[in-house]
């Protein structure tokens, strides 16, 4: 594979492998890699115990982390349309939050930077809209100073786990 022609792949031992998006800031990339490794360990553990539900959940976590890293899903080296960006941003949001402690939150700009590094500023309104949609399913909670608020709240907001956060990985209530 000629990386000048197809920059999203690298050939290793004769096989093409999709590489991570190099525009993801290093601290966020590392968090996503940590989530991917944790999810892979969860797949192995579920396989050892023959737990089908845990296996499905762990595989969804792997898919989400790989999509957030740009290794699956929309091709990061090509311009993404809004639908493709939403797929990647959703995976990024849930993977970053899942990698953090249960009571932790993240800044909307972290989602924007990791999901569309080159154009993250223009994606900020999109992240806020995506977050608002996730509050309707209780998968996400928008907070300011630790208190739930509306997305229309002026000033800095944070994104935290909602009551049904885990439904994203379990597949419950998939639309």
Q: Where is each model-derived feature located?
A:
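Short acidic, Pro/Gly- and aromatic-enriched capping/linker segments at domain boundaries
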Residues: 1-9
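Non-transmembrane amphipathic alpha-helical segments
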Residues: 29-46, 65
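Positively charged, polyanion-binding regions of nucleic-acid-associated proteins
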Residues: 85-105, 126, 130-136
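Short acidic, hydrophobic short linear motifs in intrinsically disordered regions
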Residues: 103-114
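Short helix-coil junctions and helix-kink-helix linkers
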Residues: 112-124
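Short, cationic-aromatic polyanion-contact patches
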Residues: 145-171
């Amino acid at each position: 594979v000629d990386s000048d022609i197809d920059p999203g792949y690298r050939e290793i031992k004769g096989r093409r492998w999709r590489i991570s998006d190099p525009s993801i800031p290093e601290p966020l990339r590392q968090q996503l890699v940590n989530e991917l490794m944790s999810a892979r360990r969860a797949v192995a553990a579920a396989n050892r115990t023959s737990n089908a539900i845990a296996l499905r959940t762990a595989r969804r976590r792997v898919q989400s982390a790989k999509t957030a890293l740009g290794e699956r899903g929309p091709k990061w080296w090509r311009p993404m349309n809004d639908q493709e960006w939403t797929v990647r941003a959703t995976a990024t949001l849930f993977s970053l939050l899942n990698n953090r402690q249960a009571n932790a939150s993240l800044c909307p700009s972290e989602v924007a930077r990791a999901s569309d590094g080159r154009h993250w500023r223009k994606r900020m309104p999109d992240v806020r809209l995506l977050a608002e949609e996730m509050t309707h399913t209780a998968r996400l909670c928008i907070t300011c100073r630790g208190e739930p608020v509306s997305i229309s709240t002026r000033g800095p907001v944070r994104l935290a786990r909602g009551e049904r956060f885990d439904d994203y990985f379990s597949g419950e209530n998939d639309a």
